[in-house]
Amino acid sequence: MYSQQFGTVPREFKGPTPKAVIIRAKPPKAQRAEQHLKRIQRSYHKYHTTLASIKSNEENRLKCDWIQRNNHKTFDSLVQARVQDAMQGFVINTEERRNKLRELLASEENEYFSEMQLKGETIEEKKDKMRERTKLLREKKEKERQEFVAEKLDQQFRERCEELRTKLASIHEKKVVEERNAQIEFNKELKRQKLVEEHLFARLWEEDRLAKERREAQEEKRQRELVQNTRLGLDAQVTSIQAQRQGARRMKEEEARILEQNKAQIKREDEQEKLQKQKRRQETRSSLKKAVQDKIESMQREYREDLDLNMKLVGRALQDLQDEADKKKQKREEMGREQKIYNDYLMQRREEEKAQEKELNRLLEDIKAKKLAEKDRELALQRAARKQLMNEVMNTRKLQVQERLQRKLREQEELALHEQRISESLKVLHQEDMEDFARRCALAEEYRNQLQMQIAHQQQAREAEKEEERQEFEAGLAANKACLDKIQRILSENQALSQNVHPMRRGYPDKPPL
């Protein structure tokens, strides 16, 4: 498996010297049956684990669905109850408000009747008062309308009068120029104050810088003294630390010497132990060879009781190996039985699949035969329908030919009748033309008379138009005079408004608006 993944793996590895070589141990041989059994067991375990997981997930899903369904039912019932309570409360509140409104209207009506009774007014007096009030309201409304119309006319005059707009623009321009000059002066004053403030800040900054330099010099001096004192303390500490280090170095050298001695002692002990192990291994190997030879010579002979402890241990180890071999053999037999059961199961599944496939083929053949029969029936029905349609088309064609012949005969009869009507119409038209000529002559005479009357009327209209133009000219002169008067009045009002200074300007006369 390793060689399949990573290619051929060399067994020899070179050491630090030219002739030093390390050989990798051979990998153990793969046990196919055990690996196959383990794969089957893993797949079986995985299958059952998946089934258990699916079952638990299904149970959890059903449980969650049941919980959600119960929660939805509980929530729906709670919402329904709250909605019913709210609707019932709304209905109760509506009824209460209606009752209160009825009581209030009844009390107001009673108060109104009692007040009417106390005043002793009659219906006629009340009607007179209502008429007077209506008249006052109408007059007030008419007055407001006239004021509104006058205001709009004045506004329209202000918007359309070019001379007024020119004068107002010149006045506004002069005012803007004055305010701009004042603003420029104010900005110059601000710049001058800003320069003064900058000089003051520069002086304060210089003083602060000098004070900071003095503080830094004092701090530097204090730091130098502190560093000097710290250096002296550190020198003393370094001296003591060096002495401690020398003592520690001597102790380490002593410990290293003792450690070397211990290592040499341990090395000697290891060599002795290695020799003893080799001796014991040789003894064990010889005893094992002897035991194997005895076992080969007589398998049924009882073990001798006078063997030493090492032989007993070897026999016990061999017995364990034999038990393990028996267990492996039994395990292989069980695996063989399981493999046989699995193969039987696979054969049964294949036979069942073949039977299902045969049944499916049979069903497909039946469905195919049914479809072919249905298709044959449909084709027979289509042929019958096509034949019937052809017969209907031929009959319809015959009827159309007959109708066309009849229509042609009717058209010939209608054409003869139409020619007869045309001749009669020509006679009637000639008679109407004669009557029309006589009527036109009468209309021409009447038109001539009306034209003469129209000329006389136009002369009168021109004279009236001249009179109207003269009156309009006089009215225009009067309107021009009124317009000039109005312009003067508006300019005087504008000057009066310009003299009314805003409270902020009165409070700060030296600061023009920005």
From Swiss-Prot:
Q: Please name the InterPro entries in this protein's record.
A: CFAP53/TCHP (IPR043596), TPH_dom (IPR043597)
Summary of the tissues where the protein is detected: Expressed predominantly in testis (at protein level). In embryos at 8 dpc, specifically expressed in the node, in particular within the pit cells that are located at the center of the node and have rotating monocilia on their apical surface. In the adult, expressed in epithelial cells of the trachea, brain ventricles, oviduct and testis.
Name of this protein: Cilia- and flagella-associated protein 53
Q: How does it assemble?
A: Microtubule inner protein component of sperm flagellar doublet microtubules. Interacts with PIERCE1 and PIERCE2; the interactions link outer dynein arms docking complex (ODA-DC) to the internal microtubule inner proteins (MIP) in cilium axoneme. Interacts with CCDC38. Interacts with CCDC42 and IFT88. Interacts with centriolar satellite proteins PIBF1/CEP90 and PCM1. Interacts with dyneins DNAIC1, DNAIC2 AND DNAH11 and with ODA-DC component ODAD4/TTC25.
Protein family per UniProt: Belongs to the CFAP53 family.
Give the main location: cytoplasm
Tell me, in a sentence or two, what this protein's role is. Answer: Microtubule inner protein (MIP) part of the dynein-decorated doublet microtubules (DMTs) in cilia axoneme, which is required for motile cilia beating. Regulates motility patterns of both 9+0 and 9+2 motile cilia through differential localization and recruitment of axonemal dynein components. Required for centriolar satellite integrity and non-motile cilium assembly. Required for motile cilium formation. Through its role in the beating of primary cilia, involved in the establishment of organ laterality during embryogenesis.
* GO CC entries: 9+0 motile cilium; 9+2 motile cilium; axonemal A tubule inner sheath; axonemal microtubule; axoneme; centriolar satellite; ciliary transition zone; extracellular region
Gene for this chain: Cfap53
Keyword tags:
Cell projection, Cilium, Cilium biogenesis/degradation, Coiled coil, Cytoplasm, Cytoskeleton, Developmental protein, Differentiation, Flagellum, Spermatogenesis
Q: Name one GO biological process term.
A: epithelial cilium movement involved in determination of left/right asymmetry
* Compartments where located: Cytoplasm, Cytoskeleton, Cilium axoneme; Cytoplasm, Cytoskeleton, Flagellum axoneme; Cytoplasm, Cytoskeleton, Microtubule organizing center, Centrosome, Centriolar satellite; Cytoplasm, Cytoskeleton, Spindle pole
Q: Where is this region: Disordered?
A: 261-296, 495-514
Q: Which residues form a coiled coil?
A: 91-176, 205-478
